[in-house]
Amino acid sequence: MLENLEKYKIILASNSPRRKELLSGLGIKYEVKTLPGIEETYPDTLKAEEIPLYIACEKAAAYRNTMHPDELIITADTIVWLDGVVMGKPHNEDDARQMLWKLSGKTHQVITGVCLTTVGAQRSFSAVTEVTFAELSDEEIDYYIRVYKPMDKAGSYGIQEWIGFIGVRGISGSYFNVMGLPVQRLYTELKKL
């Protein structure tokens, strides 16, 4: 379906198993290539929707000096936004527990920024999904952290895991965005290249 991409060697610049799964779901052939030590920092003046977009584009910038003319680099970043606060990946189990307590019984936003970069051009976009959690008990939170170890997930949860089944009361927007890659929007943007 995406014949226009045949001229590119597609590089997914992410170790996220969820992003790999989602990109594979589009039927796109790609390689994974990551660079160590890319800082995920941003200016304090950015709005919520700008933060993951800024970080995704900064990740892409790290590849500019090593890109080949036939490469298309896909970079992404996801944050959880609640009450004016960014929730990234937890630092430890206590941090994960605090995040899940804060999300319990509330609606938050999951925002993913995606950057598509070639030697000659760059296209970027972000997607926002609202997620409403039911009230979670301490036992449910502790069980989830102990069994699923969500240390690699923004907001300390994976919607596709147990906590999503028992705790997510509703979503508005892309389910796949909550997993880490808004694949429908990505497909649309890739068709434009």
From Swiss-Prot:
The record marks R18, T78, Q160 as: Important for substrate specificity. CDD domains: Maf. Keywords: Cytoplasm, Hydrolase, Nucleotide metabolism. Its EC number is 3.6.1.9. The keyword Phosphoprotein does not apply. The keyword Cytoplasm applies. It catalyses: dTTP + H2O = dTMP + diphosphate + H(+); UTP + H2O = UMP + diphosphate + H(+). InterPro entries: ITPase-like_fam, Maf-like. It is found in: Cytoplasm. The active site is at D77. Its cofactor is a divalent metal cation. One of its GO terms (cellular component) is cytoplasm. Its main location: cytoplasm. GO terms for molecular function: dTTP diphosphatase activity; UTP diphosphatase activity. GO terms for biological process: nucleotide metabolic process. Nucleoside triphosphate pyrophosphatase that hydrolyzes dTTP and UTP. May have a dual role in cell division arrest and in preventing the incorporation of modified nucleotides into cellular nucleic acids. Belongs to the Maf family. YhdE subfamily. This is dTTP/UTP pyrophosphatase. It comes from Phocaeicola vulgatus (strain ATCC 8482 / DSM 1447 / JCM 5826 / CCUG 4940 / NBRC 14291 / NCTC 11154) (Bacteroides vulgatus).
